[in-house]
Amino acid sequence: MNSKKYALVTGASSGIGLMYARELASRGYDLVIVSNQENEIKQTAENIEKDFSVKAHPIFMDLTDDMAAEKLLQYCKDNNIEIEVLINNAGVFFFNPIIKTAKKRVDVMLDLHVKTVAHMCQVFGADMAERGHGYILNMSSMSAWMTMPGINVYNSTKSFILNFSRSLWYELKPLGVTVTAICPGAVDTGLYGLSDY
């Protein structure tokens, strides 16, 4: 068993995910940080290791891959890493009427915000439950509570994350694992510029 505390953060190369990673590092956590921006995630790992004297494992990965969660867990097992904190932060955003939006953009959002979040919670939640402790934080949004034209796919997926997390809390709490959903308002993170898949 590895005695070090490890946290896994998705979408950690910029924005809120980067801030989560740096905050966790400041609290002494070693990190597994994941992004689909290869150069940025490597630089993030270097900066975090230099600034906080912790270990940061950068992983370049497309999280919409059906086996992404399993691949990440296998990486952790291969490197004797037990994830104590999981932050499902990776996301995309676009503002466009659904009838004028390319199918691929819709699919990426559905995959990343629904399937990936569910699979990550399923795979790492089971691993945490087996050990009897762990914490999962899922990034929802204030838009989960409202209907807005132009972001109907986005707010629907964030509603899924919110309700999924609420239900998961009841399933995992007796097993020693806590689940939280965060619903922030608009944050200027550059996400608009990253959403053009």
For the regions a language model picked out, list residue spans one by one.
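Conserved glycine-rich cofactor-binding loop
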Residues: 6, 13-15
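Conserved glycine-rich Rossmann-like NAD(P)H-binding loop of the short-chain dehydrogenase/reductase
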Residues: 27-43
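Conserved NAD(P)H cofactor-binding loop of Rossmann-fold oxidoreductase domains
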Residues: 89-94
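Substrate-binding pocket helix/loop in short-chain dehydrogenase/reductase
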Residues: 97-98, 105-110
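Active-site helix of classical SDR
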Residues: 121, 157
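Residue(s) in the substrate-gating loop at a strand-loop-helix junction
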Residues: 141
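SDR active-site lid
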Residues: 163, 169-197
